[in-house]
A protein has these predicted regions:
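Hydrophobic residues embedded in beta-strands of well-ordered beta-sheets
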Residues: 296-297, 383, 741-743
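Short acidic, hydrophobic short linear motifs in intrinsically disordered regions
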Residues: 341-353
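Short, Φ-rich (hydrophobic/aromatic) sequence segments
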Residues: 174-178, 184-275, 755-816, 820-822, ...
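Acidic, low-complexity/disordered tracts enriched in E/D and polar residues
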Residues: 2-22, 210-339
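Short, basic interhelical loop/turn and adjoining N-cap
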Residues: 355-362
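C-terminal structured domains
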Residues: 347, 632-904, 914-932
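Segments forming glycine/polar-rich beta-alpha architectures that bind adenosine-containing cofactors
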Residues: 263-273, 277-286, 291-293, 515-526, ...
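Type-3 copper protein
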Residues: 2-259, 363-694, 870-941
Length: 941
C-alpha cells in the first residue's frame, strides 16, 4: 500500500537514512522525534572535580609503576648476591632487601642495605641507591595528596553549594523530594572547609545524586529533564556520515503541571461514601451487561488503592466477568433504567421503593451493594484519559451535577486550580508556598467532605517541561540532519532497520501472543470465529492464562549451568519453539564471539548473526511493526554511532505522554491532532487503529490527548469520543485468518479490522484483564535487549569481571561494564581526615587503572541476598575525578556482598553535540519506525 502523510505529522515518513528509497520500502523512519534534554549542562559538574588531586594521583601511579619495574629488575640482579653471601646474616639481609625491592617497599635500613650491596657489586648498589631515593621521593609525593585533596574538596563543596541554587535542580526537587529540598539551604549555609557531620553528609550524598541526575540523565521529570519536539531534516551544511552535526537546543523552557489524579480519586471516594451527596449523582448500569439465562452477566471493575506515602503511586485497576442471579427486584431495576437511562441515585432508590413497596433504607442498602459490585456505576466524576487538565474537568463535572453541595465544592476547587495555574511561572520560593497552600486547601476540602484525617499522596503535582515550542516556523524546534548519522552503509539508522528483525526474539510479550492464538485455535478450530469476545477473554484467563502467567513468572531464562530454559509451551506450538530457537541461536553465537574477544574493549556482532537469528523467526515475527526506539547519538570522528537504550513496539509512544505540553495555539496546531492524522496515514490497508484506554485513569502516566480516531469501549467503561467513533466490545469479534496466520479483531459495524493500541505509559501487566488481553492482538511489544543472556562471565581479576562494549554496525547494543561485590571495590581506610581521604582517592585511581575503567561510569547496586529489578538501585552517575562523587557511591554500599555493576557513561563529554547557551547537554532521541510486511487488505471475508 502507499502511505499518505500529513505535513505536520510526527510519523510522516521519510526514506531510511543512508539508503535509497527503493532498498526497503517496507521500512520507514518517522521524520519527527521527541528529544529528552538533561536540565543542566555537563560543564556545571566540573566544579565538583579534583583535577590537581587527579594529576597527583596519576603521578603517583606512574612513579609506582616505574619503581615496581625497576624493583623487579633489581630483585633479579640481587639473586646471585644472595647465593654468594659470605655469612648467613648477610644472606638474610640481602634476601629481605630483595623482597622489599620486588614489593616496592622502602628498605628497613636503606643506607646499610646499599653498603651491604656495594661490598660485592658497586654498580648494583648504585642502582639500589637510586631506587631508594626515588622511593623516598614517592613518599614525599604521597604526602602532597592530603593538602591538595583537602583544598579541592573544599572548593568542590563550595561549587556544590553554588550548584544547589540552580533553579532547574531546585524546582525539580520540590516535586521529587521536598524534604531534601527543604534541607538544602541549611547545608548551603555551612562552611565548605569544614567536614560535614553524619546528618549533613547524608544530605550531601542525596543532593549529589539529584544534581548528577539533572545533568546526566534523560528521564523526563519536571525541570530535571525537558522534552523538545524535533524533526529530521537536511540542514544544507552537514557532511554526510561524519556524525559531527551540532544540535542547537531551545533556550526557553515552560512548565506544564497537572494535579496527581490520585487526589481526584480520593475526593470521589469521599463523595460516594456520603449518602446525602451520593443521592444527587447520576447513575448508570455498567455498560455491556447482558442477560444470561437466569443471570445478569457484566464486567465488574474494581480499584485497589496505592500507597499514598510513595513518591510515585497509583491505584491498581482490575476487571472480571461477573454474574448476578436475576430476581424481581433486579428486574424492576433494569426496567427503570430502560425508561430512564441516567437517573440520580436518590431518585432511583425512591422509584425502586415505589415499584416494589420496599422500605427506603432497604432500597438504599440494595443499591449500595450493587454499587460495590459494579453493576450500578457513578461515572460522572471519573477522570477521562484524554483530559488535558483533570482538575478543571473534575470541577466542571461537579458543576454539571447541579446540586448545592456540588456547586460549593466546585467553588472550593477554584483556589487549588489557581495554585496549579500560577505554578509554572513561579520561582522556587513561590512554588514552595503554592505546594503548601495546595496541600492545605485539598486537606480542608477532604475534611469538609467528612474525612477524619486527610489522605493525600506525597506528590501532589506532576510537571512535564517543554523546551521551545512544537512549531518549526517559530524557530525553536530541534532539527537533526539524518545525513550526519548515515555512516558508510552501516550508520545507526541503517543498523537499526536491520536489528529490528531480531527484536521479536527478545520480546517478552511475543510468547503470550502466540499462546493466545494457540488457545483460540484449540477452542474454535483453525479458521474459527468467536462472536462473544467477553467470554473468550474470561475463558482464556480462567482456563489457561492466569496459570500460564504464574508459571512463566517463575521461569529463569537460563539454569545454573547456563543452559537456556524454553518458554512454557503447554500447547506444543511450533512458533514458540521457533522463538526459543532464535534465542538459543543468539546466545550460541554470542558465546563464540565472547570466546574470541576476551580482554577486548569492544566487539562487533557480525551481520551473519543477525541474519541467522532473523531466519529462525521467519513466520513468527509480526508483519506490521510500529516501533519506538530511544537513542543517544555519539560524536565520533568519521564513525557515527548511537547507543540503543530501549525499544518498544507500538504507536506514538515518544509523544503520547507529552501531548498536553504541545496542545496550545502557539504550537501550530495541537500535537494530538498531528499524531492522530499520522495514525490514520499509518493504518494497514482495510484496518483502523482504536485506542484501549485501560479503564479507570489511576495514574497521570495514562493521560494523553486523543491520538486515534476510534476508541474501544470495554464493558463498564465510559468514553468521551464522539459516539460514531466508539467501538463497543460487543461489536467486535475475533477471526482466525489462516492465510495470514494471525488472529484478526474485526468490527461488525465498520466492516473492518480493528488494531488495538494502548497509548499510556503503564506496563501492560498493570492494566485490567480485558484491555491486557486485547493487547495480545496489537503490535505492542517490550523487547529489552539482553545481549549477554546465557553467556558466561570471564574469569575475575581480584573479584572483578568485565564485559566489552557490543556494537552492531552503527548501534551500541550494550555498554562496557564491570561487575564486582562491594568488597572488591576500594574500601575506606581506617580513621578519617585528609590523609585517609587522599589514600582512598588514590586507591580508586589505582583500581580504575588496573581494570581499565573510563573516568565516568554509572553504578547500579543490588543489595546482598536480593535479585531482580525491584531490588536494584537506579543507576547513579560516578565521576572518578571527583572525591565527592566517589563518596556518594560509597554511601550506597551497605554490605560487602552488595553487587555493583559499573557501566561506561556513553556518550561522555567528548561525544556530545547538543548545546544551549548554558553549555553541552546530555540528550536522548525517541524516534519512531514502521515496518509493514502485511499482505492483504484486512477486510472481512
Amino acid at each position: 500500500m502507499t502511505h499518505q502523510t500529513h505535513p505536520e505529522s510526527p510519523l510522516s515518513r521519510s526514506p531510511s537514512p543512508g539508503r535509497s528509497p527503493g532498498d526497503d520500502p517496507r521500512w520507514t523512519l518517522g521524520d519527527r522525534f521527541m528529544m529528552r534534554v538533561a536540565g543542566l549542562p555537563l560543564e556545571s559538574l566540573h566544579a565538583l572535580r579534583c583535577p590537581e588531586t587527579g594529576g597527583w594521583a596519576d603521578r603517583v601511579l606512574r612513579a609506582e609503576a616505574r619503581l615496581r619495574s625497576r624493583g623487579a629488575e633489581l630483585s633479579d640482579r640481587l639473586h646471585p648476591l644472595v647465593k654468594g653471601a659470605g655469612d648467613e646474616h648477610a644472606r638474610r639481609r640481602l634476601l629481605r632487601l630483595r623482597r622489599e625491592l620486588f614489593n616496592g617497599k622502602p628498605p628497613t635500613a636503606p643506607e646499610a642495605a646499599v653498603a651491604l650491596v656495594a661490598a660485592t657489586d658497586p654498580a648494583t648498589a648504585g642502582a639500589v641507591g637510586d631506587w631508594v631515593r626515588d622511593r623516598q621521593a614517592l613518599e614525599a609525593l604521597l604526602a602532597e595528596g592530603a593538602p591538595l585533596l583537602a583544598a579541592e574538596t573544599a572548593r568542590g563543596r563550595a561549587g556544590l553549594r553554588r550548584l544547589l541554587g540552580e533553579d532547574r535542580l531546585r524546582l525539580g526537587l520540590l516535586l521529587a523530594s521536598p524534604t531534601l529540598e527543604g534541607r538544602l539551604d541549611a547545608y548551603i549555609r555551612t562552611d565548605p572547609d569544614r567536614r560535614p557531620d553524619k546528618r549533613l553528609r547524608k544530605v550531601e550524598r542525596s543532593a549529589l545524586a539529584y544534581l548528577y541526575r539533572t545533568a546526566r540523565k534523560t528521564s523526563p521529570f519536571s525541570t530535571f529533564t525537558a522534552v523538545a519536539l524535533g524533526r529530521f531534516a537536511e540542514t544544507g551544511h552537514t557532511s554526510s556520515g561524519d556524525g559531527e552535526q551540532t544540535v542547537r537546543l531551545p533556550e526557553v523552557w515552560s512548565g506544564h503541571p497537572r494535579l496527581n489524579v490520585v487526589v481526584l480519586a480520593r475526593l470521589t471516594e469521599l463523595i460516594l461514601g456520603d449518602p446525602a451527596r451520593r443521592a444527587g449523582l447520576p447513575v448508570v448500569l455498567a455498560s455491556g451487561w447482558e442477560h444470561d439465562d437466569d443471570r445478569i452477566r457484566y464486567v465488574r471493575r474494581s480499584l485497589t488503592a496505592g500507597d499514598d506515602g510513595a513518591a510515585v503511586t497509583f491505584d491498581a485497576a482490575d476487571d472480571r466477568l461477573f454474574f448476578l442471579r436475576r430476581s424481581g427486584t433486579l428486574e424492576r431495576l433494569l426496567t427503570l433504567f430502560a425508561h430512564r437511562p441516567e437517573p440520580r441515585y436518590g431518585e432511583l432508590a425512591r422509584l425502586l421503593g415505589e415499584e416494589g413497596g420496599a422500605d427506603p433504607e432497604e432500597c438504599e442498602r440494595y443499591l449500595t451493594a450493587l454499587l460495590e459490585l459494579g453493576l450500578v456505576q457513578i461515572p460522572c466524576l471519573r477522570t477521562d484519559v484524554h483530559a488535558a487538565d483533570p482538575l478543571r474537568a473534575f470541577r466542571d463535572s461537579l458543576e454539571a451535577v447541579g446540586r448545592p453541595w456540588a456547586r460549593r465544592l466546585a467553588e472550593d476547587l477554584a483556589w487549588p486550580i489557581a495554585c496549579v495555574d500560577r505554578y509554572p511561572a513561579a520561582g522556587a520560593g513561590l512554588r514552595r508556598e503554592l505546594l503548601a497552600e495546595l496541600r492545605r486547601a485539598l486537606s480542608g476540602i477532604q475534611r469538609d467532605l467528612g474525612a477524619p484525617e486527610p489522605a493525600l499522596p506525597r506528590t501532589l503535582l506532576y510537571e512535564d517541561v517543554r523546551a521551545g515550542t512544537g512549531d518549526a516556523a517559530a524557530g525553536t524546534a530541534v532539527t537533526c540532519d539524518p545525513r550526519a548519522w548515515a555512516g558508510d552503509g552501516d550508520g545507526p539508522f541503517t543498523s537499526l532497520r536491520s536489528l529490528e528483525r531480531v527484536l521479536p526474539a527478545f520480546d517478552l510479550t511475543l510468547p503470550q501472543r502466540i499462546t493466545f492464538k494457540g488457545f483460540f485455535r484449540a477452542r474454535y478450530g483453525r479458521g474459527g470465529r468467536c462472536e462473544d469476545l467477553l467470554k473468550l477473554v474470561h475463558d482464556f484467563h480462567e482456563d489457561f492464562y492466569d496459570q500460564y502467567l504464574t508459571f512463566a513468572a517463575r521461569r529463569e531464562p537460563f539454569d545454573e549451568d547456563g543452559r537456556y530454559v524454553p518458554e512454557p509451551n503447554w500447547l506444543g506450538l511450533p512458533q514458540i519453539t521457533a522463538v526459543d530457537a532464535a534465542r538459543e541461536e543468539w546466545t550460541a553465537r554470542m558465546r563464540r564471539l565472547w570466546d574470541t574477544a576476551r580482554g577486548a574493549e569492544e566487539i562487533r556482532v557480525p551481520a551473519g548473526t543477525v541474519d541467522a537469528v532473523a531466519g529462525k523467526l521467519a513466520g513468527v515475527a509480526p508483519d506490521f511493526a510500529p516501533q519506538s526506539h530511544f537513542l543517544q547519538l555519539v560524536r565520533r570522528d568519521g564513525d557515527p554511532m548511537a547507543v540503543l537504550n530501549q525499544s518498544y513496539g507500538g504507536f506514538a509512544f515518544p509523544f503520547s505522554r507529552f501531548t498536553h505540553c504541545y496542545d496550545g495555539e502557539e504550537d501550530g496546531g495541537t500535537l494530538s491532532d498531528r499524531v492522530r492524522h499520522a495514525a490514520a496515514a499509518a493504518q494497514p490497508e482495510g484496518a483502523v487503529f482504536a485506542e484501549i484506554t485501560g479503564g479507570f485513569v489511576t495514574s497521570n502516566l495514562n493521560l494523553h490527548g486523543r491520538l486515534t480516531d476510534y476508541e474501544i469501549v470495554c464493558p463498564g467503561e465510559t468514553s468521551s469520543v464522539p459516539v460514531e467513533h466508539r467501538i463497543h466490545l460487543d461489536d467486535l469479534y475475533v477471526e482466525d485468518d489462516t492465510a495470514a496466520d494471525r488472529l484478526v479483531l474485526r468490527s461488525r459495524r465498520l466492516g473492518r479490522e480493528v488494531v488495538p493500541l494502548y497509548l499510556g505509559y503503564l506496563v501492560p501487566l498493570a492494566l485490567p484483564e480485558i484491555p491486557r488481553t486485547l493487547l495480545l492482538l496489537s503490535p505492542t511489544s517490550m523487547a529489552p535487549l539482553d545481549v549477554w543472556g546465557g553467556v558466561p562471565e570471564g574469569a575475575s581479576g581480584n573479584g572483578v569481571t568485565s564485559r566489552p562494549r557490543v556494537r552492531y554496525g552503527g548501534l551500541v547494543l550494550s555498554r562496557r561494564s564491570w561487575t564486582a561485590p562491594a568488597s572488591a571495590l576500594p574500601g575506606r581506610p581506617a580513621g578519617s581526615g585528609p590523609e585517609a581521604d587522599a589514600a582512598w582517592f588514590l586507591a580508586w585511581r589505582r583500581w580504575a587503572a588496573e581494570h581499565r575503567l573510563p573516568r565516568r561510569v554509572f553504578a547500579t547496586v543490588t543489595p546482598a541476598g536480593k535479585s531482580g529489578g525491584a531490588a536494584r538501585t537506579k543507576p547513579q552517575y560516578v565521576d572518578l575525578d571527583s572525591w565527592l562523587s566517589l563518596s556518594a557511591l560509597d554511601g550506597l554500599l551497605k554490605d560487602p556482598g552488595d553487587r555493583v555493576v559499573l557501566r561506561e557513561a556513553l556518550p561522555d563529554e567528548d561525544g556530545l553535540r547538543a548545546v544551549s547557551d548554558r553549555g553541552t547537554h546530555v540528550v536522548e532521541l525517541a524516534v519512531e519506525t514502521l515496518r509493514n510486511d502485511r499482505k492483504g487488505t484486512g477486510a472481512p471475508k
